[in-house]
Amino acid sequence: MLRAIGVDHLDDLFSTIPKDCRLKGALNLPEPLSEWELNDHMDALAGRMAAGPGYQAFVGAGRYEHFISASVSSLLGRSEFVTSYTPYQPEMSQGTLQAIYEYQTLAARLLGMEVATASHYDGATALAEALLMAIRITGRRRVAISRAIHPHYRQVVRTYFAPTGYELLDLPFLKTGLTDLDRMNDFHDLAAVAVQSPNFFGCVEDVRAAAEQAHAGGALFVAGFTEALAFGLL
């Protein structure tokens, strides 16, 4: 093969790489493991951690205990469910359209909404899009979001807003973990106010009071959440 491509040694293939950038010795890695050995190794590592049905998890921040039905794994094994891309050819995506319809129906019932959309990648992008929609509807250029919203959500919103020139304001939280709604009075001409409940700390916000205060200032109210199943209790 080397003769076919016109070189004498394997090192000639890397001649464009400076010698001081080349690895001089073997990589500092353990010996390779078979799949069986690797499985045993990972089980041993997992056994060192306090986890499992015998423990209660209070990590929070999006890490919650869930029961996942076996049907979920089966459905995820089907190629038409691997992507969150919205199908535009219904004759090619009947299974995906069925799943989206079921999701929207259940989400609308759970949240008490007339309609629900499924064409967003996750809650963070949906939050950002909702705030941008509020700006378009109201014609205002400022929004306020609670700092008790999950940090990953807030980072996505900041990324969306970075090139727009719109103003993104923070609502602080109190020692109780709840959003300081009184600070809304310090902001004027807001297009929207966003609050998450249950919030990042697991506190249940007074969503009705937050919405009424936002509406009093002419702003739209955006309610976010990271754990949809919490609304089965709330």
Each predicted region: which residue ranges?
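Compact, charge-rich alpha-helical regulatory domains located at protein termini
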Residues: 1-24
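Structural signal for hydrophobic packing residues in well-ordered secondary-structure cores
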Residues: 17, 21, 42-51, 104, ...
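Conserved PLP-enzyme active-site core in the AAT-like
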Residues: 125-234
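Structured loop/turn residues at beta-strand edges in well-structured enzyme cores
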Residues: 8, 113, 188
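N-terminal entrance/gating region of PLP-dependent enzymes' catalytic architecture
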Residues: 19-102
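Short loop-beta-helix segment that forms the pyridoxal 5′-phosphate
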Residues: 88-92, 96, 109-128
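Conserved beta-loop-alpha segment that forms the PLP phosphate-binding cup at the N-terminus of a helix
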Residues: 34-39, 104, 116-140
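Conserved active-site and cofactor/substrate-binding residues in soluble primary-metabolism enzymes
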Residues: 5-8, 33-40, 80, 95-102, ...
